[in-house]
Amino acid sequence: PVDRRQRQMCIRDRILLLSSNEQNYEKGDYKHFMAKEIDEQPNTVKNCVNEYIDKINKDINIFNFPFKEKEINSITLIGCGTAYHSCLIAKYWFEQLTSFDVNIDIASEFRYRKNKFKKDCLYVFVSQSGETADTYAALDLCNKNKMKTCSVVNVIESSIARDSKFVLPIHCGPE
């Protein structure tokens, strides 16, 4: 058994500072936060897209991508709830703009099926919070099978971000 002093030595506290910008936490003149978030969506999307676009070279910038493009022939997008709906839209755009085969899976189903993991597939996990339990379990399953994993999350300190081999933060601000 581990005594209390040993247990305390194993735990490391880490303080994360949130944005001090009150605009992120106040609803201002809006009746509801949801109305505020809907109104802010165009700027939020623009900021996210601009993070990854090189306007001068008219190209996409994804720095430090750990996989060789030639090693990837397909993409599987995995999420739950509204993140799953984001995967549906992403599938459409990937198919329009790339030659990749794209599949979508609901995380809660993915983890219970008998999956045929493919070494040439990039498994992309989508989660706003980065803490969705079913999505995390699906990521863990892929990691145990040594698959190529990537996450699209808003919280870069999240469990899903930490355990993915590559992270694409969306920088949408606090929930």
Region roles according to the model:
Residues 54-71:
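A short, well-structured juxtamembrane/interface segment
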Residues 14-18:
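Flexible, low-complexity linker/loop segments at domain and module junctions
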Residues 48, 56, 100-102:
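Short coil-to-helix leader/linker segments, especially the first N-terminal amphipathic alpha-helix
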Residues 1-11:
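Single conserved hydrophobic/aromatic residue that forms the stacking wall/gate
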Residues 70-175:
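Glycine-rich phosphate-binding loops that contact phosphosugars or nucleotide phosphates
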